[in-house]
Amino acid sequence: MTTSATPMAAVDLLQQALNSNIIPNQEYLLQGSILDSAAEHLLHRLRGLCDNVDTGPEAFADYEMCLSLKVPNEKTPVMTVRVRKAQDTDAPYQLRYIGQPELGDRNRPTLVRSSLDIACTPHVVDFLTEMGFRVDFEYITKGYMFRKGRMKVTVSKIFKVNSSEPISQSYLVELSVLAPTGQDVIADDMRIFAEQLKPLVQLEKIDYKRFAQMP
């Protein structure tokens, strides 16, 4: 006769999985942008390079909300999380935690940061609000997704909620991989793939701290 695992047993199993490096908890990321006038050329290039050649890219439309937990009289949030929901499918809500980029080796070709994605119920926003989280901003992302092995490429536009007009005349291009800790060889694979997209788009590590220091 089988019995359900106790909470402590579940925690132990999770810790064992983390120690065994089988949980994809690190995101390797490169980002860039491309003007509307050149986007079709990039999509054509990606169709030829990526795995879903026959079926074409996967279109998506996601609603995303950023919430933060702050301490009174402190400017820096204690924690920031994101809640995402695909608008055109019955997929569950996604709760996502994104950590600060690792300093690490400056010669590393990609940005690396902790990332955890959890499927959850539609009540997740109410739950976070009860915990003290507050909404910082929200937006809609619409675009196309390609796959190349473990790599994911998205070409998307950002819209304000309840607006049909994009916030800019360019597309955001992201190349990312979710992987367990310590698989830095992925970064080299991403660099090689990004080179194949030049000169249409320049994918690079983005220094978010530099943006935060801008007046």
UniProtKB/Swiss-Prot annotation:
Organism: Aedes aegypti
Source organism superkingdom: Eukaryota
One example of a Gene Ontology biological process annotation: regulation of transcription by RNA polymerase II
Job description of the protein: Component of the Mediator complex, a coactivator involved in the regulated transcription of nearly all RNA polymerase II-dependent genes. Mediator functions as a bridge to convey information from gene-specific regulatory proteins to the basal RNA polymerase II transcription machinery. Mediator is recruited to promoters by direct interactions with regulatory proteins and serves as a scaffold for the assembly of a functional preinitiation complex with RNA polymerase II and the general transcription factors.
GO MF annotations in UniProt: transcription coregulator activity
UniProt subcellular location: Nucleus
Gene: MED18
Gene3D superfamilies membership: Hypothetical Protein Pfu-838710-001 (2.40.320.10)
Keyword Transmembrane: no
Family statement drawn from the similarity comment of this UniProt entry: Belongs to the Mediator complex subunit 18 family.
UniProt keywords, alphabetically: Activator, Nucleus, Transcription, Transcription regulation
Gene Ontology CC terms, in alphabetical order: core mediator complex; mediator complex
Main location, first listed in the record: nucleus
Subunit structure: Component of the Mediator complex.
Name this polypeptide is given: Mediator of RNA polymerase II transcription subunit 18
